[in-house]
Amino acid sequence: MIAELVSSALGLALYLNTLSADFCYDDSRAIKTNQDLLPETPWTHIFYNDFWGTLLTHSGSHKSYRPLCTLSFRLNHAIGGLNPWSYHLVNVLLHAAVTGLFTRFSKALLGDGYWTFMAGLMFASHPIHTEAVAGIVGRADVGASLFFLLSLLCYIKHCSTRGYSARTWGWFLGTGLCAGCSMLWKEQGVTVLAVSAVYDVFVFHRLKMKQILPTIYKRKNLSLFLSISLLTFWGTCLLGARLYWMGNKPPSFSNSDNPAADSDSLLARTLTFLYLPTKNLWLLLCPDTLSFDWSMDAVPLLKTVCDWRNLHTVAFYSGLLLLAYCGLKNPSLEGECNGKALTNGKQNANGHSCHSDVEYRNSEMKPSFASKVENGIKNCVPQRTQLPSTENIVILSLSLLIIPFIPATNLFFYVGFVIAERVLYIPSMGFCLLITVGARALYVKVQKRFLKSLVFYATATLIVFYGVKTAIRNGDWQNEEMLYRSGIKVNPAKAWGNLGNVLKSQSKISEAESAYRNALFYRSNMADMLYNLGLLLQENSRFAEALHYYKLAIGSRPTLASAYLNTGIILMNQGKTEEARRTFLKCSEIPDENLKDPHAHKSSVTSCLYNLGKLYHEQGRYEEALSVYREAIQKMPRHFAPQSLYNMMGEAYMRLSKLPEAEHWYMESLRSKTDHIPAHLTYGKLLALTGRKSEAEKFFLKAIELDPTKGNCYMHYGQFLLEESRLTEAAEMAKKAAELDNTEFDVVFNAAHMLRQASLNEAAEKYYDLAARLRPNYPAALMNLGAILHLNGRLQKAEANYLRALQLKPDDVITQSNLRKLWNIMEKQGLKTSKT
């Protein structure tokens, strides 16, 4: 028990520095924006959606079905909201628990001694686990490992009690249930059933390959046959249910996720897929270079047989075959053991035990004997199974290393990554056992005390180095900026692009732009990076450049709805209404099939329709606007905030004088967001129009209360007061509005108009002048400034503004009439005019 506690304590201690870490990388989509974690989402949705919140049967789903992990995230969210501390705490505790269970499992193979201790400490400290433990989404791998080990330990108990206790099938039931739970944490958990079969055949029964079929069908080995058959049946059921639940279709991924899968060359695909397990093993052996992402060109394709990395592949598979051969070549010392207690494969008889080299190497746990007397002769009857031989442990370790890794090899279907460090969490158990049993064999082999000490201190040093590397790597996972900077040398395109997002969120605009451009230098066709750079430029009023990058993004990925959306908004603001209309329409017609994030796509499509409706609204095409708004309501995803859309529906109905319908949609807007200020203002106008003055005033005042710094609220309230002939109050509201939003033309212009209506002409002149400076080429602003100057007796300035307005709009009848009246006054006063 001491080994388990110490190993767990080390696993806990090494990851304590992750408790202060933030959400990083995939955590954002799996937790921060995952609607399945929210209390308003029915919890049953977890069992129909994938890990990222997309419907599992959707063509764009990653098919990653991990409901128990998502359920744990939801519990975290219910208790602590989006405080990352609690999420990290659960991950660390799970890792400590897995470490303890792995040490307990190792004890069943290695005995209660130094080598079990070494295996546990190595697993606790291995740096390959940092992504799984420090990254919150890695909880799927850690949770799957927990139930993987529980299932395996239950099966070991089943084997040891088979034929002696009725409870043996209770242990088998535990094996099946834990295997199912492991699969519901992460898909590879189901492979524990295959590992259990390997344990039963090669470790517990110590069969070699050619003995399996003849032995398993013998009557006395019926229990072995039954166990293996049930494991196979249950595994088939789990896999069948899993495939059915995801719609019997494999997931689809982009070229950048797994470039080899998209390669046209069969040779390149074959050589690369054969090489990748070699690269994964190297990460286990020497986890010096780790990265948050290994997609894109992080591992260049092997395109020819002359690529020197093929030597690594040959060496890897040769070593693997050699290990397997060494583990399986020795003949079984007892082929038909039927689970009986063994000492070195032979039943102990007449009280004598045989100590071969194999037994010596496993002498940490000796069999216990109970005395019983038969015919006056005292015999010793073995009570428990002797520890497995080194060869047996090698076979089991290889199965632990290889079988859980098989789903990630692209053997049965293409996966959405090149290398994923967290996928190695379960296979690392086999690796740690292999290293431990190898060190133990070397320790036994050498005779000199100095060499034995060298083996001992070398393994201890390795564990120390692993622990130090883990602590350092945890520092990279403290926040996204540190994580992405650490990944630049491995995957520069992805790392620079993600770093640009972080720098932009920190308002480091020039650094963010530089990061985006660096990402595009390494990979120029990344649609997301082109879009992000365009968005950055748009937000900094560099509209021509932004349009250029949006068009490049659309060219790289024609289904990128958000790029169409922002392109249309820029065109609409530039007055290019027909181009904007075509862009919005094209966006609205893009289907959501095979898209990585269908929720984000639907949101962008809904926003495109909303803006198209606004465009029609501004053109006075209210019926068309309503039709587009209805389509937007039909297409919007459940997480879309609909208050602005509902409010615009109300506006359109109000312009069509359909007041009951308008009131309905204003109320819908307020129901969806009770503090939505535009709905308070528009509904207030409707109430005033229908004679409910006191109610209207309450809504205007509520809007001001919600945001006292918003000039538009004072403007609408002032307009209401003006219509009620409360001129003094209206004038105060107008001044307040113009002071707060002195850069907003509409607010300033309307304030000036209200002050003029309140006969406060001097104040009105001040704001008409400001409005004309905000829009120097807007005829109405110049005409109104001319009119107030005319009223205030500043005739020559009034003439100049009238003339400028007529240059911009020569056929304006009101301006022409005002100018003629002005000239008459100027002539009467003997002032020079520009009439001639």
Swiss-Prot record:
EC class: transferase
Membrane-traversing stretches: 1-21, 78-98, 108-128, 133-153, 169-184, 185-204, 221-241, 313-333, 393-415, 423-443, 450-470
Membrane topology: Multi-pass membrane protein
Renumbered ranges of TPR repeats: 493-526, 527-560, 561-594, 606-639, 643-676, 677-710, 711-744, 745-778, 779-812
Transmembrane as UniProt keyword: yes
Segments on the Extracellular face: 22-77, 129-132, 242-312, 416-422, 471-836
Pathway(s) served: Protein modification; protein glycosylation
Molecular function GO terms recorded: dolichyl-phosphate-mannose-protein mannosyltransferase activity
InterPro entries found in the cross-reference section: TMTC_DUF1736, TMTC_O-mannosyltransferase, TPR-like_helical_dom_sf, TPR_rpt
Catalysed transformations (reactions): a di-trans,poly-cis-dolichyl beta-D-mannosyl phosphate + L-seryl-[protein] = 3-O-(alpha-D-mannosyl)-L-seryl-[protein] + a di-trans,poly-cis-dolichyl phosphate + H(+); a di-trans,poly-cis-dolichyl beta-D-mannosyl phosphate + L-threonyl-[protein] = 3-O-(alpha-D-mannosyl)-L-threonyl-[protein] + a di-trans,poly-cis-dolichyl phosphate + H(+)
GO cellular component, one term: endoplasmic reticulum membrane
Main localization (coarse): membrane
Cytoplasmic membrane side: 99-107, 154-168, 205-220, 334-392, 444-449
Its biological purpose: Transfers mannosyl residues to the hydroxyl group of serine or threonine residues. The 4 members of the TMTC family are O-mannosyl-transferases dedicated primarily to the cadherin superfamily, each member seems to have a distinct role in decorating the cadherin domains with O-linked mannose glycans at specific regions. Also acts as O-mannosyl-transferase on other proteins such as PDIA3.
Annotated family: Belongs to the TMTC family.
The protein's name in its UniProt record: Protein O-mannosyl-transferase TMTC2
Natural source organism: Mus musculus (Mouse)
Upper lineage: Eukaryota, Metazoa, Chordata, Craniata, Vertebrata
Gene: Tmtc2
